[in-house]
Swiss-Prot record:
Lineage, broadest ranks: Bacteria, Pseudomonadati, Pseudomonadota, Gammaproteobacteria, Enterobacterales
Record family assignment: Belongs to the universal ribosomal protein uS10 family.
InterPro entries noted in UniProt: Ribosomal_uS10 (IPR001848), Ribosomal_uS10_CS (IPR018268), Ribosomal_uS10_dom (IPR027486), Ribosomal_uS10_dom_sf (IPR036838)
GO molecular function: structural constituent of ribosome; tRNA binding
Keyword Nuclease among record annotations: no
Matching Pfam families: Ribosomal_S10
Keywords: Ribonucleoprotein, Ribosomal protein
Subunit structure and binding partners: Part of the 30S ribosomal subunit.
Domain of life: Bacteria
An example Gene Ontology CC term for this record: ribonucleoprotein complex
Gene transcribed to yield this protein: rpsJ
Organism: Wigglesworthia glossinidia brevipalpis
Function of the molecule: Involved in the binding of tRNA to the ribosomes.
Name of the protein this chain belongs to: Small ribosomal subunit protein uS10
Keyword Ribonucleoprotein in annotation: yes
Length: 103
């Protein structure tokens, strides 16, 4: 387990939730004696939608909406058995998508 690396990718629409979750992960990993790199903020994806408001063919009346997907990356370089166990038990916010890969 000493030579492995755990890479955690987080995605969320709310930047406060993702920052809170990354701080919980980093705090848990450091408390168990692992080395942490990050959190690294990845580029935010902005998805824009334009909707016609008028029921007729009036192209001047439009509303625009956007969804921002915030992303963070955390690398745990030298995880211990305690680190893996603590991360498995960690309860994160429901609005955060977590992807974990071992490398």
């Amino acid at each position: 387990m000493q030579n492995q690396r755990i890479r955690i990718r987080l995605k969320a629409f709310d930047h406060r939730l993702i920052d809170q979750s990354t701080s919980e992960i980093v705090e848990t990993a450091k408390r168990t004696g692992a080395q942490v790199r990050g959190p690294i903020p990845l580029p935010t994806r902005k998805e824009k939608f334009t909707i016609l408001v008028s029921p007729h063919v009036d192209k001047d009346a439009r509303d625009q909406y956007e969804i921002r997907t915030h992303k963070r990356l955390v690398d745990i370089v030298k995880p211990t058995e305690k680190t893996v166990d603590a991360l498995m038990r960690l309860d994160l916010a429901s609005g955060v998508d977590v992807q974990i890969s071992l490398g």
